[in-house]
Amino acid sequence: MAPNIRKHHPLLKMINNSLIDLPTPSNISAWWNFGSLLGICLMTQILTGLLLAAHYTPDTSLAFSSVAHTCRNVQYGWLIRNLHANGASFFFICIYLHIGRGFYYGSYLYKETWNTGVVLLLTLMATAFVGYVLPWGQMSFWGATVITNLFSAIPYIGQTLVEWAWGGFSVDNPTLTRFFTLHFLLPFMISGLTIIHLTFLHESGSNNPLGITSNSDKIPFHPYFSLKDILGFTIMLLLLTSIALFSPNLLGDPENFTPANPLVTPPHIKPEWYFLFAYAILRSIPNKLGGVLALAASVLILFLAPFLHKSKQRTMTFRPLSQLLFWLLVANLMILTWIGSQPVEHPFIIIGQLASITYFTIILILFPITSALENKMLKY
């Protein structure tokens, strides 16, 4: 019998082992769809971004006009821009749900996969930040100024570091040029990291909602999960196109319709919605260095997840106390997101400070204690 090209061709067999004949646990739920949805987000963003870059001019005097020109004069330029801007929001929705799934079901115990995932999140955040600066509107400019300025809190080398990053003494043309360069480069770095992420995942195989070994009950990825993924793609792309066509500026800041002006500061400087939780934590500490450290810790704390796992069970499926704590954490993150969008005044200051303390307390203290308590209750 002739050899099957899908299983023997050096390149095709890699694709086959990753997407077609991949042994997959039969009981993974829709929460396992977000990995592939992130892949679709990445491909959509690279495609729309490439088309936008073809019409963009990274120069302070032309950037704003070039984006306006793309929307007015390029065939479907408005649609490409709206898909790209809102695609970023969907990217973050998917990655937050993906991380939440990993946290709930104990997927972080695959340490290599989890750590590469956190690095992916950090790279995505960097990409989104530099991308937001490119239209060179008011919020682009002041957002870049405020966030890059945080590096000056680093003792001794801070100020030098900031001026080196800016390429001058303020956010100006060199800054915009290098941000465009980085925004073009980073998505390809994300693609490379994604391959590493998947390589580590396929070493161990997928986790499942029960958190027990599923070697005795595996089914091929195709057609079962390929079809399930396509359903996910359809729903997400339908939502993305709907928002891009019906309400493209829903998540944006009206301030960004005004060209950047270093002489006028917007009344409320705030990042896009997906960074608001971290921004609230940054603002809740009345000290610059302390705020920067808290901001970094709010995301880097994910690296500690494998070490904070004290339960004898992997997932939270059969751990009601940990479940309660998990949803408290989700609610807390939503409160932080809301606080990040509000002005710095009473009562928002104190709410933000309490929510920030709660965020770290739940993850660092309450989760391990609750896990130990649940172990005791089960008489382990």
Curated annotation (Swiss-Prot):
Principal subcellular localization? mitochondrion
Q: Does the keyword ATP-binding apply?
A: no
Which CDD domains does the record associate with it? cytochrome_b_C, Cytochrome_b_N
Record localization: Mitochondrion inner membrane
Q: Which UniProt keywords apply?
A: Electron transport, Heme, Iron, Membrane, Metal-binding, Mitochondrion, Mitochondrion inner membrane, Respiratory chain, Transmembrane, Transmembrane helix, Transport, Ubiquinone
Note on how the cofactor is bound = Binds 2 heme b groups non-covalently.
Which Pfam families would you find in this protein's record? Cytochrom_B_C (PF00032), Cytochrome_B (PF00033)
Is Membrane one of the keywords UniProt gives this record?
A: yes
Q: Which domain of life is it from?
A: Eukaryota
Where on this chain does heme b b566 bind? Answer: 98, 197
Query: One MF term from GO for this chain?
Result: metal ion binding
**Which cofactors does it use?**
heme b
Its Gene Ontology cellular component terms are: mitochondrial inner membrane; respiratory chain complex III
Anything else known: Heme 1 (or BL or b562) is low-potential and absorbs at about 562 nm, and heme 2 (or BH or b566) is high-potential and absorbs at about 566 nm.
The subunit structure is: The cytochrome bc1 complex contains 11 subunits: 3 respiratory subunits (MT-CYB, CYC1 and UQCRFS1), 2 core proteins (UQCRC1 and UQCRC2) and 6 low-molecular weight proteins (UQCRH/QCR6, UQCRB/QCR7, UQCRQ/QCR8, UQCR10/QCR9, UQCR11/QCR10 and a cleavage product of UQCRFS1). This cytochrome bc1 complex then forms a dimer.
Give the similarity note.
Answer: Belongs to the cytochrome b family.
Q: What does this protein do?
A: Component of the ubiquinol-cytochrome c reductase complex (complex III or cytochrome b-c1 complex) that is part of the mitochondrial respiratory chain. The b-c1 complex mediates electron transfer from ubiquinol to cytochrome c. Contributes to the generation of a proton gradient across the mitochondrial membrane that is then used for ATP synthesis.
Q: Mind telling me what this protein is named?
A: Cytochrome b
What is this organism's lineage? Eukaryota, Metazoa, Chordata, Craniata, Vertebrata
